[in-house]
Amino acid sequence: MTPDDTKIAIIGGEVYAPSYQSKSNIIIRGDKIDSIGTESYDASEYQSATVVNAADCIVIPGLIDTLVHGGGGADTLFSDAKDLEKTARAHAVQGVTSIVLTISSASMEQINRSLEAVGYLANNPVEGGARILGSYVEGKFGSREKRGAQNLEYICPPNFEDFHAMWAASDGTIKIISIAPEDDDGLGFTKHLATYSEEAYNNITVAMGHTNATYDQAKAAIDAGITRATHTFNGMSGMHHRNLGAVEAIFTHPKIHAEIIVDGQHVNRIWAKTLIMWKGIEGVGLVTDSTASAGISKEEWIQHSVYEPDLDAYRLDWEKLSAGSNLNYYIKNRAVWINLGERDARLYGGMITLMEGLRNVVSWGYSLEEAVTMATLTPAKSLKLDNQKGSIAPGKDADLVILDAELNPKAVMIEGKFVKHELSS
């Protein structure tokens, strides 16, 4: 038997594909899903298969996080390819089987160095790690007024000179580029990439994020080809009953895929639920905006921090060193802040992985089917990868997560190989 003929039978689990399938058996052949069905498992038919008993467990597609700045102690902007392997593995063991590594505003030299590292990993999958689908360029072409924690020094209007340099450095692996469409030639930039996305740019997606656009400017950008919103609500104009902005354009235009950070800190759950109510589960993708802290146990990060009781937060010395910055980084309520307690305090990013985000959304009253859809199939569709990933169906990549009743991952499979396995066979 060759490795490509290897068979694995996952039997007796409650399957959400992401739609509920009841108790089903899933047969894996090589790196693909061979079949899924509710009929009794016939051991004689798959005598050569490795049998995994998923009774009393839940089986879902591998989660897809499209906004990941780091994890496992590594930050996309400041790490080489070797260090970013830790990020891929930290997310994988938590059931996140595909990630888009996100790069913040910085010098072109630093951005291109990061894009090269991500491009290498996109073309050379990490053993035991989440599949890196490509990179997400965020903040470089954003608004100075809505920069959030982006480095103000390096923000500039969208331009083709920088973009083509980034595209070359990435080896054609940039999946998403976020812009403030109101800046200079934002519309022309968007139209060009949207027009030639499939032909010349491997289906790159143009998003609006860190934007101070008016409603009319945002609508014009959507008409020009923007199809995605970078972490909706955070770093964007709007949320006013008279002076409408980007947020209202996202709500009222069905073609926009709206990312939403689901740590409960970046966005109040009431607004997150309102967004989902308006756009539906097929229009909203769950993301984390995770930093280097994601996937690290409290015991580990607490060793690199100092508790400050006045702020009820932990100051992270190692994050400060990792980022090469004179800013102070704090963990508070599962989010990372800069300069907490000062006038310029800002949210820096998240420290959860998407599996924790999934549990949050379920705790907000959504069914598991709804939450899983927003963490799997919806993001896969937004990247035009739903023919490969995002659901449990014959012919698709065998990216699966087996959960216990509390939605903790007991086993994780990426393209037919277990990267975590705590179940009996």
Where do the protein language model's features map onto the residues?
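Histidine-rich, glycine-flanked metal-binding segment
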Residues: 2-60, 425
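Divalent metal-coordination and catalytic microenvironments
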Residues: 13, 26, 31, 56, ...
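C-terminal cap of metal-dependent C-N hydrolases
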Residues: 13, 376, 381, 391-425
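Metal-associated gating/positioning segment near the N- to mid-region
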Residues: 54-114, 245
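Active-site mouth loops of central-metabolism enzymes
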Residues: 70-81, 149-156, 207-209
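Divalent-metal coordination cores built from histidine and acidic residues
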Residues: 88-173
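Active-site core of metal-dependent hydrolases
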Residues: 168-298
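His/Asp/Glu-enriched, well-ordered alpha-helical/loop segment
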Residues: 248-258, 277-288, 294-402
